[in-house]
Each structure stands twice: as structure tokens, then as C-alpha cells.
């Protein structure tokens, strides 16, 4: 009786099974699977091909890759997959992977530091050829241990001063300064930076610092404040919004990312506040819904797809053996002006 193709309840066929079915040696089967057809006769190739079809054999690409030292797999860890920023960056990485012939494995750490560590260990054990990371705030020594082990690594949207690896992201200082200058030009005197806890996350601290520098340079009569909020604490957000709305100065809220912008916009609507009549509103990222909310919300658009694509290009260059000092590619942000930052004169006239 001839063997039948493997089913889910049977052991998957192996190279040994193929060799036995084709009545050839395992070396010949390995050569066939590796594309070394010149070393096999046409009759031998046909027998192996027929045996593979009969048994339903599928080669273990992971095992073959490990044996050759190449898995063609890239690991990626994102801080928050529910953030549109992360999704668009991931699309850029994936598009570049397809062009370069790599497969992408994505892990979502869900803003949990311990989960981030576990995923990095998991991907390393899977023998990925390189890692793209958008870290929550993992200590540099943890990332250094990966880099020092010889695994190529690219960091997105974070700056690690003492880590010798490539980094790709937004020019946060340029983008925050551009946004703050716009708010001041529109007549806003008090700029309130609403952000998730800054901690050791360089992108958040750089945005805050740039905002404060621009406001300080504007001179007396202008002020800047920072409100750090846990996304899950809706009561704290509502309280912060009430205090901001009571300001005697013409005020604007500068939301630190897309998720914060959404929460702030919803919170203002619940309080019956209008933008820009009662308060100005501007946010990092430019989500699709921003153009539809009220008079439209002004935002800083990031080239997120390009950031992801560039990160993978850097990584593949390292995988291919390029040797150079650590590189940093910072993309400029683009100001998208809408009604939420309308000048006081324009608001009064309407």
C-alpha cells in the first residue's frame, strides 16, 4: 500500500520518509530542497518530486534557515498596537520586508515593560535576523545586551544616548517647535501640554522641552505647563480640562500623541467646550477623524510609513554586514492647520 499524505492526526512526513518513498538517499533529497538540481539526474529529481507530492511533505523552513544561519525573519515589538501611529509604522516595516524578502513577526507589548522584555527574549530565541523596536521605556542596558550579542537592532521613535544602534523617528524638537510657534502666532498665550507620563521616553521629553523653549523665547505674557495623565484615569483628565478652561489667558491644549488627542477632544465635548471659541486644540499625529471633529483639529502629521520603511532598510544593511557608527534619521513633521487653532479675531467674526 502506498503512503498517503499526512493528516492533522499523523506525524508530519520527514526528509527520511521522502527518501524512503523515492528510494534515494537523504543527501539527494536535501540537494533537491536546496535547489541544487545540477547535481541530480532528471530521473532522480522526478522521483523526489513525486514522493514529496505523494506524502504531502512540507520542508521545515525554520530548521533549514537555522542550519544555514539565515531565517529571513525580522522581529518587531511595538509599544501599543491600538495606537494608529504604531499601525502605520508597522505597515512601513512590513512593506520594506516584502521588498527585501523577509517575513515580519510582530509583538504588542501593550505598554507593559515586563511583557516587552518577554517578547524580546521570545523573538531572540526564534533566531530572527534583526529587531525593530518601538520601546515603552526599556532600560538601555537591556537593549545593549541584545546589540552586544551581535543581533542587529533599530529603535523607532526613541533616543538612547549610550546605545550603539541605529535610530529612526520624528524630529520631535522641530515638530513641537513648529506647532508651538503656530499657536503663539494665532494669539494663544498659555500652552498646556497634555501627555502620558514622560518618564524616560525621549520623544515625550523632547516635545515638552521644545514647547517650553519656544514659549520662553516669546517673552513675558506667555506661559507653558505640562499635564501628565494616565490614559485610564478619565476623572483626572476631566479635572485637568476644567482647570484649563478656567484660565484667564487665551489657552490652547497641545496633546502629546493621537490617543491623548482623542481623549482630550472627547473630554472637552463632554464638558460642552468648543474649539477654538473656548480653547485652542492641537495634537501630535493627524488621525483621519481629526478633520471631522468640530471645525477640524490642527495636527502635526508624521511620515509614519516612511519611518517604518527606513527602519527596516537600516536593519537590512546591518544584517548584510555594513559597519559604521550608529545612525540617526529624523524626519520632519508637517503642520496641518484646521479650525481648532483659529485666531481670536477670526473666531469673533464668525
Predicted segments, located by residue:
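Hinge/beta->alpha junction and helix N-cap segments in small-molecule ligand-binding domains
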Residues: 78-88, 107-115, 168-178, 194-240, ...
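Short acidic capping loops at alpha-helix termini that bridge into adjacent secondary structure
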Residues: 189-190, 222-224, 274-280
Amino acid at each position: 500500500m502506498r503512503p498517503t499524505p499526512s493528516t492533522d492526526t499523523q506525524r508530519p512526513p520527514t526528509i527520511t520518509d521522502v527518501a524512503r518513498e523515492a528510494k534515494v538517499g537523504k543527501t539527494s533529497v536535501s540537494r533537491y530542497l536546496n535547489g541544487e538540481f545540477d547535481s541530480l539526474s532528471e530521473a532522480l529529481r522526478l522521483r523526489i518530486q513525486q514522493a514529496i507530492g505523494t506524502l504531502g511533505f512540507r520542508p521545515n523552513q525554520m530548521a533549514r534557515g537555522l542550519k544555514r544561519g539565515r531565517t529571513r525573519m525580522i522581529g518587531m515589538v511595538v509599544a501599543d498596537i491600538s495606537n494608529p501611529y504604531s499601525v502605520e509604522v508597522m505597515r512601513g516595516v512590513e512593506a520594506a520586508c516584502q521588498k527585501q524578502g523577509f517575513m515580519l513577526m510582530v509583538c504588542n507589548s501593550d505598554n507593559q515593560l515586563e511583557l516587552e522584555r518577554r517578547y524580546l527574549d521570545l523573538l531572540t530565541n526564534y533566531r530572527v535576523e534583526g529587531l525593530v523596536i518601538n520601546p515603552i521605556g526599556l532600560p538601555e542596558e537591556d537593549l545593549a545586551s541584545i546589540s552586544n550579542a551581535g543581533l542587529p537592532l533599530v529603535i523607532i521613535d526613541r533616543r538612547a544616548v549610550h546605545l550603539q544602534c541605529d535610530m529612526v523617528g520624528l524630529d520631535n524638537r522641530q515638530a513641537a517647535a513648529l506647532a508651538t510657534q503656530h499657536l503663539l502666532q494665532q494669539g494663544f498665550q498659555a500652552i498646556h501640554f497634555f501627555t502620558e507620563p514622560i518618564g524616560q521616553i525621549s520623544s515625550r521629553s523632547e516635545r515638552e522641552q521644545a514647547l517650553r523653549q519656544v514659549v520662553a523665547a516669546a517673552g513675558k505674557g506667555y506661559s507653558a505647563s505640562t499635564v501628565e495623565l494616565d490614559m485610564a484615569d478619565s476623572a483626572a483628565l476631566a479635572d485637568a480640562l476644567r482647570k484649563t478652561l478656567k484660565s484667564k489667558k487665551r489657552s490652547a491644549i497641545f496633546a502629546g500623541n493621537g490617543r491623548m488627542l482623542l481623549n482630550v477632544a472627547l473630554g472637552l465635548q463632554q464638558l460642552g467646550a468648543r474649539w477654538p471659541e473656548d480653547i485652542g486644540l492641537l495634537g501630535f499625529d493627524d488621525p483621519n477623524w481629526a478633520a471631522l471633529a468640530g471645525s477640524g483639529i490642527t495636527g502635526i502629521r508624521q511620515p509614519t510609513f516612511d519611518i517604518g520603511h527606513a527602519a527596516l532598510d537600516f536593519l537590512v544593511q546591518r544584517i548584510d554586514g555594513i559597519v559604521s557608527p550608529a545612525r540617526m534619521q529624523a524626519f520632519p513633521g508637517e503642520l496641518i492647520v484646521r479650525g481648532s487653532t483659529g485666531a481670536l479675531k477670526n473666531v469673533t467674526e464668525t
